[in-house]
């Protein structure tokens, strides 16, 4: 027997920027016992992220920006170094990530490669992130990047070896960025 889920109640606690649900559901275990759970679930939509890399120069493009949740959780500056990313809204993942790449990094990417889709915090957040990589060159730089009007993004072109070292030193602590940098290392695309 497989587990069965029955929704008992879905109460919206907040629908400001994203939606916070208070969900009550019954979970029927494999042995037939029914367990009632009450959980808060944060629905922020799905997203996409991309790591830009240059195999000839042995560099990657990352961004640095303020992330309020990290600041609330003790990151004194609130600054986070991460891969370019954004919410899908109503776009397809590849369309979204191309748009975000030019807005945030200033690079107009060519061929992109989708790697995988992952839930990053499935215990309470609905977001499914689509992960991409793309090679970039200096000739693809269309503008300075930096995000849209309500963003303050610094574009960082770093040696790949330095970015990997920044994981070890704790300078890079963003999960999606660590995953993509490690993928790039394991794939030997930078060898």
From Swiss-Prot:
PROSITE patterns: NUDIX (PS51462)
Any one GO cellular component localisation term in the record: cytosol
GO biological process, one term: ribose phosphate metabolic process
Binding site for Mg(2+) 1: 85, 104
Keyword Metal-binding: yes
Keyword Hydrolase: yes
Motif Nudix box, residue numbers: 86-106
Record remark on domains: In the dimer, the N-terminal domains are swapped between the two monomers, such that residues of both chains contribute to the active site.
Family: Belongs to the Nudix hydrolase family. NudK subfamily.
Protein name: GDP-mannose pyrophosphatase
Organism whose genome encodes this protein: Escherichia coli O1:K1 / APEC
Encoding gene per record: nudK
